[in-house]
């Protein structure tokens, strides 16, 4: 059940004609009401999928996860491929596609980029509403002919990233990618819409140092932390180096070099 806090009360509602049953299922699963006249947000079932809408005057538009169309699809087609800074940050090179754990998945945009470039992705999202949006977007994407194979390389885990990482029992990821929530001051449209919408729900990631420490203990090859370009490093060990972009940078904490996988010889016939 989601703990309803002041300024972040949420109700579930169906906007699609036949969505009432589905809305009731989400409400039960998340422990949210279907009716709350004083709600600050509405998790809405629409014909185009699940979306989150802030209620009231002068609020940003609804946010949903869509890997098939829109900005994410455009980035997949025209974003620069392996030349993108995020690809360089996680260590993508010819013959190298590391396994990556995105421990701050959010809406899954960065994870989708890496999956589209061939990385096997695990995603962790701890905020249940954001995780629901992401789960819905992944489910819709699986049925698309073009991006279905990409979505197949993405699996979603819901819960506290630090706890999940500390109790990890599977083969460790080669790379752990972190993009902690940071107090943004930019006035871009993206910040106004998504950051304005999510900040009352998630706040800032005050446990980022503990998350970094857990990531460094699990990742076999490197940890990558995305930060606003002028933001300080996360408290803790200093990164080995950084890749700087126009508005953001990637702090790299290398452990050992990534190498191409050896190709096993074909069996004799």
UniProtKB/Swiss-Prot annotation:
Gene3D superfamilies: Vaccinia Virus protein VP39
InterPro entries recorded: 16SrRNA_methylTrfase_J, SAM-dependent_MTases_sf
Alphabetized GO MF terms: rRNA (guanine-N2-)-methyltransferase activity
UniProt xrefs under Pfam families: SAM_MT
Catalytic activity annotation: guanosine(1516) in 16S rRNA + S-adenosyl-L-methionine = N(2)-methylguanosine(1516) in 16S rRNA + S-adenosyl-L-homocysteine + H(+)
Record key words, sorted: Cytoplasm, Methyltransferase, rRNA processing, S-adenosyl-L-methionine, Transferase
Residues holding S-adenosyl-L-methionine: 125-126, 179
Places the protein is found: Cytoplasm
Keyword tRNA processing: no
Gene Ontology cellular component terms for the protein in this record: cytoplasm
SUPFAM superfamilies to which the protein is assigned, alphabetical: S-adenosyl-L-methionine-dependent methyltransferases
Location (main, coarse): cytoplasm
EC numbers on record: 2.1.1.242
PANTHER family recorded: RIBOSOMAL RNA SMALL SUBUNIT METHYLTRANSFERASE J (PTHR36112:SF1)
Function text: Specifically methylates the guanosine in position 1516 of 16S rRNA.
Similarity comment text for this entry: Belongs to the methyltransferase superfamily. RsmJ family.
Protein name per Swiss-Prot or TrEMBL: Ribosomal RNA small subunit methyltransferase J
Gene source species: Pseudomonas syringae pv. tomato (strain ATCC BAA-871 / DC3000)
Gene: rsmJ
